[in-house]
């Protein structure tokens, strides 16, 4: 993430303006307030609100913040929890951290540390018995047929 701090000088004051940009596939774009709330401040988008919750095209889900590949569409499944669910990450793409509540396990992009969601095990949704519960707002999607 590129963080740019601009200083503008008025009559008797200096004003600071912070601008956040994300590099997605080589394109720089401004991070929205909602994206900052979830990706940087470790928030959660409302259930059933994300664009990838009921999205099942073939391709790769990438980190919205840095563009690193995170999940393949073959690992996505319908869990009914309200967020995109994956039973396997791309090897080395995800880092697991103990959540502040001491119960859940947070998942972040291993490349840039962007908050993705949480991982749960032992629920029996798939044979792999793992559910990565991910905020859609933390993801972008690259279709296989580009």
Protein language model annotation of sequence segments:
Residues 9:
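Short Gly/Ser/Thr- and charged-rich N-terminal loops/segments
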Residues 3, 12, 18-20:
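Intrinsic-disorder-associated, low-complexity terminal segments enriched in Asp/Asn/His/Tyr and depleted
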Residues 18, 23-146:
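A short Gly-Trp-Pro
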Residues 6:
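Iron-sulfur (Fe-S) cluster-binding modules
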């Amino acid at each position: 993430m590129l963080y740019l701090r601009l200083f503008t000088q008025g009559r008797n004051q200096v004003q600071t303006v912070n601008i956040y940009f994300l590099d997605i596939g080589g394109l720089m774009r401004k991070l929205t307030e909602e994206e900052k709330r979830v990706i940087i401040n470790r928030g959660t988008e409302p259930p059933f609100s994300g664009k990838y919750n009921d999205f099942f095209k073939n391709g790769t889900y990438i980190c919205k913040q840095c563009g690193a590949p995170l999940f393949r569409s073959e690992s996505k499944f319908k869990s009914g929890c309200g967020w995109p669910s994956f039973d396997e990450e791309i090897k080395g793409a995800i880092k697991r951290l103990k959540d502040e509540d001491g119960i859940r396990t947070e998942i972040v992009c291993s490349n840039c540390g962007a908050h993705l969601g949480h991982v749960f095990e032992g629920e029996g949704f798939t044979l792999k018995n793992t559910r990565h519960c991910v905020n859609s707002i933390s993801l972008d999607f690259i279709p296989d047929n580009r």
